[in-house]
Amino acid sequence: MAHEILIAETEAFLKNVAPETRTAIISAITGGKSACKSAAKLIKNEHLPLMSGEATTMHIVMRCLYPEIKPWKKASDMLNKATSSLKKSEGRDIRKQMKAAGDFLGVESMMKMRAFRDDQIMEMVEEVYDHPDDYTPDIRIGTITAWLRCKNKKSERYRSNVSESGRTALKIHEVRKASTAMNEIAGITGLGEEALSLQRQTESLAILCNHTFGSNIMRPHLEKAIKGVEGRVGEMGRMAMKWLVVIIYFSITSKPASACNLKTCLNLFNNTDAVTVHCFNENQGYMLTLASLGLGIITMLYLLVKIIIELVNGFVLGRWERWCGDIKTTIMPEIDSMEKDIALSRERLDLGEDAPDETDNSPIPFSNDGIFEI
């Protein structure tokens, strides 16, 4: 039963893929270890017309079925990034519950996937992908099946009383705002060239959205492309903020206050050689000066603490390596996944493959005794 439910969810996930590609993947999954390994190799070498998210998902499914399939760095990096915000205690707790589940039916009692946060779900997926031999086949299949069920539920026609067209329109608006944000980041940080490149990509995506908005064929592909841009824009924004903290700190410390300057500042209100116009008396001026100095000192201390935290994260916790990897995948990808996905979306639009039927809103049938019905 577990294997059949996984196949059904995989087929539902691939509903927007070209029919021959979908058939080839399903045939590989049902054809045994040798067929699955061959298909995983084709996916890894990008010989199948799949978008980046589809490719990594299918590789995760195949490795969960057959641990002999070697992990793919692209899929591992995606999982690491998705779980980077998860607390260590939460990760330990999730792993303990997974091992205690025992069998396929036991996954339901500890999962309740719809109540889980995305990073908790991805922690489970990462566990069965990175350490498949630590879990029984039923636990691996149950985890991946539930993950696919969540992804398929999120792609239903209506969700939270907002139509798919309405959600896409909101996302297009976010793309335009991202383009403006990248323009601002290019002007204030040292990430100018990369920010401008990402801005051009967001503008191109916005133009493509305007031309294809309302197309049932293009809607899921546009949403995936927009989601990819959102992640890259978010990473660029975080890098820009870290860059600004360093710049502001060194701008302030480049001109430290001397004792003489401090004395001059404190006695500024007693200066009778210059004509000044103000509405403060002597005591008020003295207090305002002290308050300004106090705020300046607090700001300096805050920035210094931020610098120390970043140094600790880099040298002690080893997070700089992961951050550098994020920078590489964000601004220097080996293959621009977004452009590749957009090109594939255009190809699918031209071929007119697998257009959803507006009159058919019935869900894809699944077994009534499936354990993940909540």
Swiss-Prot record:
The chain crosses the membrane at residues 239-259, 289-309. Palmitoylated. A lipid is attached at residue 324 (S-palmitoyl cysteine). The modification Phosphoserine is found at residues 337, 362. Glycans are attached at residue 270. GO terms for molecular function: channel activity; structural constituent of virion. GO terms for biological process: monoatomic ion transmembrane transport. Keywords: Disulfide bond, Glycoprotein, Host cell membrane, Host endoplasmic reticulum, Host membrane, Ion channel, Ion transport, Lipoprotein, Membrane, Palmitate, Phosphoprotein, Signal-anchor, Transmembrane, Transmembrane helix, Transport, Viral ion channel, Viral matrix protein, Virion. Residues 1-238, 310-374 are cytoplasmic. Belongs to the influenza C protein M1 family. Ion channel, which might have a role in genome packaging and uncoating processes. This is Polyprotein p42. It comes from Influenza C virus (strain C/California/1978). The lineage of its organism: Viruses, Riboviria, Orthornavirae, Negarnaviricota, Polyploviricotina.
